[in-house]
Amino acid sequence: MTIAIGKSSKEPKGLFDSMDDWLRRDRFVFVGWSGLLLFPCAYFALGGWLTGTTFVTSWYTHGLASSYLEGCNFLTAAVSTPANSLAHSLLLLWGPEAQGDFTRWCQLGGLWTFVAFHGAFGLIGFMLRQFEIARSVQLRPYNAIAFTGPIAVFVSVFLIYPLGQSGWFFAPSFGVAGIFRFILFFQGFHNWTLNPFHMMGVAGVLGAALLCAIHGATVENTIFEDGDGANTFRAFNPTQAEETYSFVTANRFWSQIFGVAFSNKRWLHFFMLFVPVTGLWMSAVGVVGLAVNLRAYDFVSQEIRAAEDPEFETFYTKNILLNEGIRAWMAAQDQPHENLVFPEEVLPRGNAL
């Protein structure tokens, strides 16, 4: 019998392998390689938003109060966009605008770019987290694919749209009332509700809500009779592996209701994935179009006839007048640096007035 004496054949681990072992170790909160992007970015985005809504004014950028310190509440506080004069500057704390002065940086709107970019990369990190965990447990990456929808909307609205305009100033501020104002701005300046990409987005989101409600109700409807009571939560364990509802019964039910029904669970759930994600992506594509001021539907013939005939008016022409009113009021308020003045006689009036 021969005994081999010498070095072990096992090679010492390198830095990458050691980091990989530590990052992907089984723990209560999985970290992973994606966590190197997700956790710092999410921390800074949320921390920047809480700091801004609590302490930072928008007086120097919008002429507004926007913090709890100034008397705002949860619905009216916001981290507002930088001034229009700062264009597309990244507004780095150490950049030429703030020159390392934290107070001045906050006054100029530096927290907005800070929250926007850390938020975008945080969302991307969360998508990568879903991909990484799915790969480690041998799942398909459809969760990560689905999450590209919210990422596309965030990036298109908060980053691409203002990049197509004159500056970050025209992006939404990070606050409830601030985003509502941005929605009104989108309608007044882009007639967004008549844009077919917006229509597809609405169909996707509301259609997904309808599908979700129908699916949940159908599963509850077809639960096996496994106890004496009518209560859904009796006679079964919430963690059990066995199914407690009948797909065949659900299929019969919807075949009677509509005449058609999903033939298998895979097609049903793919459809529930496809509808909202496609809607979100279509709305994101539409916002990218608005970034370069693409028009959607303009029914000019109706506008000309309404201008010539006092008795002719449609819901479209009324909405066009409403948009003109939004622009007339919003432009002067939102862009005081332009010194816009609209005389009373040029403000829009409908034929009914």
Curated annotation (Swiss-Prot):
Chlorophyll a ChlzD2 binds at residue 118. It is found in: Plastid, Chloroplast thylakoid membrane. It comes from Chaetosphaeridium globosum. It is an enzyme of class 1 (oxidoreductase). GO terms for cellular component: chloroplast thylakoid membrane; photosystem II. The modification N-acetylthreonine is found at residue 2. This is Photosystem II D2 protein. It is a multi-pass membrane protein. The keyword Chloroplast applies. GO terms for biological process: photosynthetic electron transport in photosystem II.
